[in-house]
Amino acid sequence: MSAEPHPLYRQLPAIDRLLNEPEMAPLLAEYGPVLLADTLRQLQAEAREYIGQFHTLADWCADWPAALRQRLNQRQPALKPVFNLTGTVLHTNLGRAPLAESAIAAVTDAMRSAVTLEYSLEGAGRGHRDRAVADLLCALTGAEDACIVNNNAAAVFLLLTVMAAGKQVVVSRGELVEIGGAFRIPDVMRQAGCELVEVGTTNRTHLKDYRQAINENTGLLMKVHTSNYSIEGFTAAVSEQQLAALGQECSIPTATDLGSGSLVDMTRYGLPAEPMPQQLIAAGVDLVTFSGDKLLGGPQAGIILGKKQWIERLQQHPLKRALRADKMTLAALDATLRLYQQPDRLVEQLPSLRLLTRPASEIAACAQRLLAPLIACYGTDFTLDIESCWSQIGSGSLPVDRLPSWALTFTPKDGRGSTLEALTARWRTLTKPVIGRVADGRLWLDLRCLEDEAALLRELAS
């Protein structure tokens, strides 16, 4: 015989009855009947489970409107702002570069109103969505034209598809990179319908290696900047200028995937050197690709610069429509690029550059200010210290180089890793989660990216 249903189940009110109660009217006006009904079903399922386990009603069953409001208040957006205290400035998993205020304002304006996305005010007709941003890029880099897609992987894929589908692409063996998410250059070439021709060795490639690989089916000579690793020691590589000259001699286009790509000389700000797109354009490279949300400090985007004849081919290919950027991306990119027209104010206005160039002394002072109030909150269970550490740029940018920084460390007094795990798990449930890193039996909060100390203290004291 089947078990009799628990009599307490009959005390659970029908959803229709609950929705018609006067106390529900404000919630109905705020959230609508569909969301309320779905949430009430979840609550009733939990109530039945509670009855089955404890043979009594849960306390919150005495006030369904209050329980419903509490549950609705707990709903969180899929993308939550967090405190990035990992020590990785351009953290791919945490959204890479924070946008400048002017870029945020531009995106907001683009969302609120109709915009001239593909409309020419001068000609009162159809325009091209890349045009305004392309003109800015050309002015900043000296390129003849530019093309914008939704990320750099798309830029590389479009370039290979248009320039070399059914043909051979010659690349140094030492530049066959893999980036996060198993994005491998050989795999991308295969998907684009290209045949990869590896030349040279892992550590040494010469111009003659490229020359010997050229035949009637060669479609592209390519270089890939090894932005997420470094080969040192007994090495040799072909410069973009040398490869471009060979391409011109043999009437074969050349391309370079920069990956990160910076429009300013990073050494000017005390950071390690990184090749700039304008340098490669000046060297004669036909097409250059790089990301918008790494060292550039803008939105996720793939940027292709180069000769007008090749950019026009990219723009005309059907794949471009599938990969094109939307109005919000273009608005943010446009606003970000305009900041580069005032290089003397770039550190002040571009958040990513401001964080990358933040002096270690300023970070140490921040740690000193935070130490005492955090000891008051956590000193019972943890030993808190200020430690020097090294931040990294992230997103495959300048992989070998580190930035001197300072961190607050939390060491559990009971010596248990589970205590650290419990702390980090609790911090991930905060209104604005705090994300650090665990290493050497301690939790490290690298303070390089912390700009609102008061907000952090409010969260950690809650």
Curated annotation (Swiss-Prot):
It is found in: Cytoplasm. Its main location: cytoplasm. Its EC number is 2.9.1.1. The modification N6-(pyridoxal phosphate)lysine is found at K294. GO terms for molecular function: L-seryl-tRNA(Sec) selenium transferase activity. One of its GO terms (cellular component) is cytoplasm. The keyword Transmembrane does not apply. It is an enzyme of class 2 (transferase). Pathway: Aminoacyl-tRNA biosynthesis; selenocysteinyl-tRNA(Sec) biosynthesis; selenocysteinyl-tRNA(Sec) from L-seryl-tRNA(Sec) (bacterial route): step 1/1. It catalyses: L-seryl-tRNA(Sec) + selenophosphate + H(+) = L-selenocysteinyl-tRNA(Sec) + phosphate. The keyword Cytoplasm applies. One of its GO terms (biological process) is selenocysteine incorporation. InterPro entries: PyrdxlP-dep_Trfase (IPR015424), PyrdxlP-dep_Trfase_major (IPR015421), SelA-like (IPR018319), SelA_trans (IPR004534), SelA_trans_N_dom (IPR025862). Keywords: Cytoplasm, Protein biosynthesis, Pyridoxal phosphate, Selenium, Transferase. Its cofactor is pyridoxal 5'-phosphate. Converts seryl-tRNA(Sec) to selenocysteinyl-tRNA(Sec) required for selenoprotein biosynthesis. Belongs to the SelA family. Homodecamer; pentamer of dimers. Binds only one seryl-tRNA(Sec) per dimer. This is L-seryl-tRNA(Sec) selenium transferase. It comes from Yersinia pestis.
